[in-house]
């Protein structure tokens, strides 16, 4: 077996290292099929300024996304009123985003150095996390959309189906289903020496010209197209239902809440699709045998990949702007943190003032020498 797909998933398109100049790549290079030749290298080919820009973007996304997603998970765990079915799915999405954001410093280092310096174990770990995130995110968004469909179109059935415990069970099933992809990919992944550089790769079995396209197209279908189709059907039915009746639950307040949550889920799904469509399309094109042929195209691919990771730090911002409960909890957390800091400063000032006063008093009571 030869290493075909640089993994994690972002490397499927253009790999971990370009061999100096794209014009030097030929269909016979390393025995790779033509549509996978750009899996040879990217970092050594890109200008240093561009690499630094991409690395800076990765690190900014990492820091902002970790803070936001950890806050989302804390709020859901801390407040009982936040443990709704929808928020349980949001917790799962935040968990998947947090895990993949933790891999960005390693990816950024790989981009900057032009090779993988972290060894075989971390290679397998990063590969597994990246694939887990890809599938758990799309599966969770699909589950959220089906959940909203049941709430809007089948409100009576929703009373029994839409519970926190059942949402948790669905989340467990999502991670178990993601294992079907993640474990084999992690097993196939390894850090290997390719063309005098260490690369983190997934080995595709022979015949490579058959399994390579099958791998890429399967990823495209099961991690993107099929979930998006299911989501589209759910929202088409919901929109028809929302336009067909004035009151869904008999209460205007409950109706406003239903529509608000549905709008939140729709926006989260739309942003996800917008962020991931470019890189997913490139994966499909690459899998079908069409390869990019210029430095500009490779740079665009890299930024499209970065856009996919930007999605992981956008979700907490969307929750803060579109959901009143999250907004209130975020505000409460920030105010409590600010109040705690003020109290610490105040206590410190009082302590210093007390020490100064005590020192002055001691000085005054000391008898002067005759």
Swiss-Prot record:
Gene name per UniProt: OPRL1
SMART domains, per database record: 7TM_GPCR_Srsx (SM01381)
Segments traversing the membrane: 49-74, 88-109, 125-146, 166-188, 212-236, 265-285, 301-322
S-palmitoyl cysteine lipid modification positions: 334
Keyword Lipoprotein: yes
Ranges of the Extracellular topological domain: 1-48, 110-124, 189-211, 286-300
Residue intervals on the Cytoplasmic side: 75-87, 147-165, 237-264, 323-370
GO cellular component: cytoplasmic vesicle; neuron projection; plasma membrane
UniProt-recorded name of the protein: Nociceptin receptor
Origin species: Cavia porcellus (Guinea pig)
């Amino acid at each position: 077996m030869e290493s075909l797909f640089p993994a994690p998933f972002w490397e499927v398109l253009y790999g971990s290292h370009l061999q100096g100049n794209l014009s030097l790549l030929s269909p016979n290079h390393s025995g790779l099929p033509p549509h996978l030749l750009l899996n040879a290298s990217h970092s050594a080919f890109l200008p240093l300024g561009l690499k630094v820009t991409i690395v800076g973007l990765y690190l900014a996304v990492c820091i902002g996304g970790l803070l936001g997603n950890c806050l989302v998970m804390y709020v859901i765990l801390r407040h009982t009123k936040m443990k709704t079915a929808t928020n349980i799915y949001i917790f799962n999405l935040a968990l998947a985003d947090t895990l993949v954001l933790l891999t960005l410093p390693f990816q950024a280092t790989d981009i900057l150095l032009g090779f993988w310096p972290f060894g075989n174990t971390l290679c397998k770990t990063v590969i597994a996390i990246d694939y887990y995130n890809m599938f758990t995110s799309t599966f969770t968004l699909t589950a959220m959309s089906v959940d909203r469909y049941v709430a809007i179109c089948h409100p009576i059935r929703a009373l029994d189906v839409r519970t926190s415990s059942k949402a948790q069970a669905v989340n467990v099933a999502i991670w178990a289903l993601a294992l079907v992809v993640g474990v084999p990919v992690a097993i196939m992944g390894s850090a290997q020496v390719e063309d005098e550089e260490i690369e983190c790769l997934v080995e595709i079995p022979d015949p490579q010209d058959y399994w390579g396209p099958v791998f890429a197209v399967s990823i495209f279908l099961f991690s993107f197209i099929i979930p998006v189709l299911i989501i589209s059907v759910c929202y088409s039915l919901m929109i028809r239902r929302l336009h067909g009746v004035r009151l869904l639950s008999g209460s205007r307040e409950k109706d406003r809440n239903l529509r608000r949550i549905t709008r939140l889920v729709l926006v989260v799904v739309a942003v996800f699709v917008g962020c991931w469509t470019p890189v997913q399309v490139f994966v499909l094109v690459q899998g079908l045998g069409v390869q990019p042929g210029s430095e500009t195209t490779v740079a665009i691919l890299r930024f499209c990949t970065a856009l996919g990771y930007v999605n992981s730090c956008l979700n907490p911002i969307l929750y803060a702007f579109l959901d009143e409960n999250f907004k209130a909890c975020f505000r409460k957390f920030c105010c409590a943190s600010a109040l705690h800091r003020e109290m610490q400063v105040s206590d410190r000032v009082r302590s210093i003032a007390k020490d100064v006063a005590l020192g002055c008093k001691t000085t005054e009571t000391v008898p002067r020498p005759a």
